[in-house]
Amino acid sequence: MVATILSPCYAQASEYSDYVKHSEATFVENGKKYKVEEDLISRGDKIKTTSNFFTDEGVLIETQITTVDRSVGIVYFENRNSDQELINSESYRFDQILELTESDEETHDVFVTYSNDRGKFLRHEEYTINLTGKKLTALVVGSILAGVFAIAPEVGISIGGKFVAAVTSAGLLGAGSIMPWNVRASVDVYSSPYRTGKHYTRFYGDFYTTDGEYITSLHWSKRGYH
């Protein structure tokens, strides 16, 4: 296991000073079924997530502990074996991490990215997204620093809070939809390993108005797509 699968309520934790959440999930890796039990605790500026990974028979494999301290801008990571012996521990500043969380658009699983290594460069893409008639749908998909919103789902793009603020200030955000508007996307595409035998295609996009005004930068992924 190289990444922590987070509960769908992870984004909410950053909005509350006192928040506790327990969640359970299963996943399949190399034909074997596994279970993860996760406890998330938010206290003030600290968000701690403890994830225990089990075999399908209930045998503990390993434990991953992630602590986000927003007061100092640092993420702490611990990995322990089935006997709870420390395997490794790392800490990263927020500015060292390309994205704190990454979401699989197919399964909506969310995992923490601890490295700014993008992987193998595949291609560069540029295109324009027409937002005419698109509804603005809030998706709680595990962002630590801000809620994530999905616009133009046919291209799998998640637009962050800065985008929403820009649209609102421009008077383009209605009660439930966005008035006609175009966004220009400049995207670098990479192939990056996730777990053993699996790869994710990672997208790093900069978004602009058609007049060239910068809006925001985003990071998303697709599993099993190249």
Name each model-derived stretch.
Residues 41-139:
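Cationic, glycine-rich low-complexity segments
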Residues 162-182:
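Transmembrane alpha-helical hairpins and terminal membrane-anchor modules
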Residues 2-21:
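Sec-dependent signal peptide cleavage junction
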Residues 152-162:
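Membrane-interfacial hairpin junctions
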Residues 16-42:
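Short Lys/Arg-enriched alpha/beta "domain-start" segment
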Residues 23-25, 36-38, 49-51, 64-66, ...:
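One face of beta-strands
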Residues 224-226:
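Short, solvent-exposed mixed-charge patches
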